[in-house]
């Protein structure tokens, strides 16, 4: 019988993210040699790649950082939260983020073609999935540039790394504090657009049409319907447009007002939430 302890099993599980039964089988096959067992898990994982292709990857983490006034953010996914919080998966996520920064990647195709340690990210994805015994994916990347870029990462569970991330670019010499506060606001309130001008015209027209039809169905006088439509459109903007939203820390002010008082202007943002 192979000579290994419960501590050996725990350590190998933490290194590989593999299940307990798979770890014990690998240690048995390797006569208790942890390095050999890790290689056995990796090889068996590679053989199972095709079987994992159709599996759902609803768990994961978000990682972000800035470099020379440019913010980069990536979302990487796994099948289970056990793997998502494992050291190998977090290391994988950091390598993906490093590649995004090095390649100045602004879209997923550019990121997947980027290299880490002499190999493309797409190959690293396959190897990591083999090691962990789960399907892993690089879901998306964001690049935001500006005079100042704030980064905010939020943990939705104390047991997991960050699963919500925000990049916010602002202009203005003394905008750091306001930028951080607004980044936290974005994480909580999930705006869809930076300004009213960013809302697609067809979306605006649809909101107007719905508001008009609703007003008529409610029997409102025809002469006041245009005012009702404008009022409801304003309410829609307040829900989805960042600068129009009530500021989370002080609902008496809009986000736009908070930025203006700090001498700042928001120029771009990105928000990721795992699975959303």
Curated annotation (Swiss-Prot):
Any one GO molecular function term: translation elongation factor activity
Main location: cytoplasm
UniProt name for this protein: Elongation factor Ts
Function: Associates with the EF-Tu.GDP complex and induces the exchange of GDP to GTP. It remains bound to the aminoacyl-tRNA.EF-Tu.GTP complex up to the GTP hydrolysis stage on the ribosome.
Top-level taxon of the source organism: Bacteria
Family matches, as PANTHER family: ELONGATION FACTOR TS, ELONGATION FACTOR TS, MITOCHONDRIAL
Swiss-Prot/TrEMBL keywords: Cytoplasm, Elongation factor, Protein biosynthesis
Pfam families for the chain: EF_TS (PF00889)
CDD domains with a match to the protein in the record: UBA_EF-Ts
Family per record: Belongs to the EF-Ts family.
Compartments reported by the entry: Cytoplasm
